Amino acid sequence: MKFYLNGQSKFDEIKLNIMLIKSEFREQEDLVPLIISDVDEIVDPIEYIAGLDISFVKDSNQAVASMVIFDYKTLEIVAKLSLNCVLNIAYIPGYLAFRETPVFLKLIEIQKCHCPHLSPQVILIDGNGVWHPRRAGSASHFGVLSGIPCFGVSKNVLYVDNITRESIQQLLTEKANEKDQFVEVKDNHGNTLGLAYNVTGSVKSAVYISVGHKITLATACQIFQSVTKYRICEPIRQADLLSRQIVDKLSK
């Protein structure tokens, strides 16, 4: 865990991170009541959707955030945007939103400036929404601050309550062991966290869909199904490819 400030001791670093966690914890608590997950507040019909992702230069705090916008009907790419940045905020598990959301919001500003006619009605983020220990992952954080309907799609299980990768794989094996099947995942109180989606037919390669903001889980699932060719849905896959291509150039 690293907090990039010059000349600080290890003790100072720990103190700063504790202060950061306390501040971010309070902000997440304040954000949760603002999340809309029981109704769709999406402009209809959907014309454009987008994927957001971020990649890092190895052993560096340099990063590239990317946004790829698609025509929803044809799934053709209509715009690509990227932003080179330096992320000086420490990565702390469970608080990823505070590191990535400001950059994603800046990308939205760039998009509105350069191609406002292509504004996406729904955004897919590589990460989690309400599937989060405090029900406020990156997709929810971004959604509330941007006001744009969005949901998260993650390749990794975020442990909440007693949910683990092994328990999810067992659940998928029992109830959704074939390609394009999914199961609803709930927390200890019976609240829905999201879907574990068996895209490829291998339970070990499932992805995890959760509501971010202004969208229901059912609608998020429908959109995911309509834009997915491989394990990773196309908007996020293309955003990832774009950011990695730029990172590769920066690394040379």
Predicted features and spans:
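Two-metal-ion RNase H-like nuclease active-site motif
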Residues: E47-V57
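Short gly/pro/ser/thr-enriched loop/turn and capping motifs at secondary-structure boundaries
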Residues: V157-D161
